[in-house]
């Protein structure tokens, strides 16, 4: 009887928020210059409330669509046996650890300009193809000289990936517990 008195709960669809406010519901990267800078300053204040933005606000990081574009990457051709393959290399990593923006300096929350915080070195050319680097061979005291499961000797020219691959294969085929 008590269940009959309770109202039934039901699910209802969420109504979209009305497109109000200064931005009109447009994404930040499509806004005009002044409004975009105001939102950027507001974001910086939100991240660090003790921040004082009386002076110039650090420049806004470039949106991926605003970065300079270059033509199609040149294809590299290589031959394996009788077949010839073409390959387009990946572009270089433009946002690696040396390219990050450091806007806040220390615990005090003082702003730094991204240009002052980055080391002074030439920016990488986004149109330049990356160099293929050889992986160093396994050397040193920590390197295994042979497989602990099958006792196969590892050649000194093998890379760490080759050694790890062999160890994984041996471990997968093994039915014994191995203590390292």
UniProtKB/Swiss-Prot annotation:
Zn(2+) binds at residues 147, 150, 166, 170. The modification Phosphoserine is found at residues 113, 137. InterPro entries: FA_core_complex_assoc (IPR052689), FANCA_interact (IPR031491), UBZ2_FAAP20 (IPR031490). Residues 1-28, 106-135 are annotated as: Disordered. One of its GO terms (molecular function) is polyubiquitin modification-dependent protein binding. Keywords: Chromosome, DNA damage, DNA repair, Metal-binding, Nucleus, Phosphoprotein, Zinc, Zinc-finger. It comes from the Eukaryota. PANTHER family: FANCONI ANEMIA CORE COMPLEX-ASSOCIATED PROTEIN 20. Component of the Fanconi anemia (FA) complex. Interacts with FANCA; interaction is direct. Interacts with REV1. Reported to bind monoubiquitinated REV1; however it binds better to non-ubiquitinated REV1. This is Fanconi anemia core complex-associated protein 20. It comes from Homo sapiens (Human). The gene is FAAP20.
